[in-house]
Amino acid sequence: MVDDPNKVWPTGLTIAESEELHKHVIDGSRIFVAIAIVAHFLAYVYSPWLH
């Protein structure tokens, strides 16, 4: 892995592979946050003790 200049230490991924993986992680995080916001809003609306 050290001999290959296209691979990035310590993952062994190329720059393009790491950018693609990063894009998927960020997209997944955005989806998770959107679901969490909806869930918190619904919990607030339907929980009488929060009002």
Swiss-Prot record:
It holds the Pfam family LHC. This is Light-harvesting protein B-800-850 beta chain D. A bacteriochlorophyll binds at residues 22, 40. The lineage of its organism: Bacteria, Pseudomonadati, Pseudomonadota, Alphaproteobacteria, Hyphomicrobiales. GO terms for cellular component: plasma membrane; plasma membrane light-harvesting complex. Gene3D superfamilies: 1.20.5.250. Residues 47-51 are periplasmic. The gene is pucBD. Signal peptide: none annotated. Belongs to the antenna complex beta subunit family. NCBIfam families: pufB_517_ASD (NF040862). Keywords: Antenna complex, Bacteriochlorophyll, Cell inner membrane, Cell membrane, Chlorophyll, Chromophore, Light-harvesting polypeptide, Magnesium, Membrane, Metal-binding, Transmembrane, Transmembrane helix. GO terms for biological process: photosynthesis, light reaction. It is found in: Cell inner membrane.
